[in-house]
Amino acid sequence: DYIKNSGEFPEAANWGLEWVGSIPGKRESRRFHGPYRLTEHDVLRPQGFPDTVAYGGWYVDTHPPMGVDAPEEPPCVQHHFAHLFPLPLRCYHSRNIANLFFAGRNISATHIAFASTRVMATCAVGGQAVGTAAALW
């Protein structure tokens, strides 16, 4: 309301709100534990896995786990690289529930590895892999 009605931003006088997300998204929350936990070493120095089902390529983009509640922490750290890294099926299923698969941001990964795997494109290819694996399971 302030931007539209204050008079300080005349170009916004006729703007209308088109869409608002109904649920705010957290950058990081729960991650499940699979038979393998992807680490930052797997992302930064990929070696390959015999059960690779997807690839990621986003840089490592870490943010403080406490977010704005940690003003003493640097806001973010980015480690760029020019390679893809493999994601094993073992990161996408439960280590103790036989028929439970994960897809999206909850895969078995460390905080630092998650800073690269949490992006939409990587989640999408992982979701495709999990769907295929579930159909074959």
Regions found by a protein language model. Give the residues of each.
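Flavin (FAD/FMN)-binding glycine-rich loop and adjacent Rossmann-like elements that form
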Residues: D1-W137
